[in-house]
């Protein structure tokens, strides 16, 4: 794919090369834009975490994880428009959960990690997610609860 340099006059002109093939309409969805980014930057770093251990995923590696997660969500009964909650510290896993949910066609319900457990539980009851992604620190707390979706 031909690389188009960004200028002040045409900051989004590069999208014209994919319009009608990678996406239809004026603007791509986030999953469509991510696939375009994979084509443009495939082997470049996409997600990096430095502590406690350095983890870095390329765009291509991230897409592979995102597609696997989207397939798992679909096999778990998540369908277009279903809610999937995501709560956790900033990490590659959080980003993959967010993108995987979008790739599955579901609605992401991001929940602030800084909230107290009872506040999170109230949000989960209101959102009625089919699946709730939570990090290891809170897994035990929410895996035993009912009405919070599959944890």
Language model: regions and residue ranges:
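Structural core segment of the AMP-binding/adenylate-forming
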Residues: 1, 75-76, 103-151
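Conserved AMP-binding/adenylate-forming core of the ANL superfamily
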Residues: 26, 43-99, 116-121
């Amino acid at each position: 794919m031909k690389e188009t340099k960004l200028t002040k006059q045409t900051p989004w002109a590069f999208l014209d090369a994919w319009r009608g093939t990678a996406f239809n309409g004026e603007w791509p969805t986030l999953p469509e834009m991510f696939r375009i980014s994979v084509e443009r930057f495939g082997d470049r770093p996409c997600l990096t975490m430095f502590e406690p251990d350095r983890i870095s995923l390329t765009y291509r590696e991230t897409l592979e994880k995102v597609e696997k997660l989207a397939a798992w969500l679909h096999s778990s009964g998540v369908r277009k428009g279903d809610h999937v909650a995501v709560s956790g510290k900033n990490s590659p896993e959080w980003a993959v959960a967010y993108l995987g949910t979008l790739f599955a066609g579901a609605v992401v319900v991001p929940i602030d990690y800084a909230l107290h457990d009872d506040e999170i539980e109230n949000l989960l009851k209101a959102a009625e997610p089919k699946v709730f992604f939570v990090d290891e620190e809170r897994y035990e707390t929410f895996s035993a609860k009912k009405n919070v979706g599959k944890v």
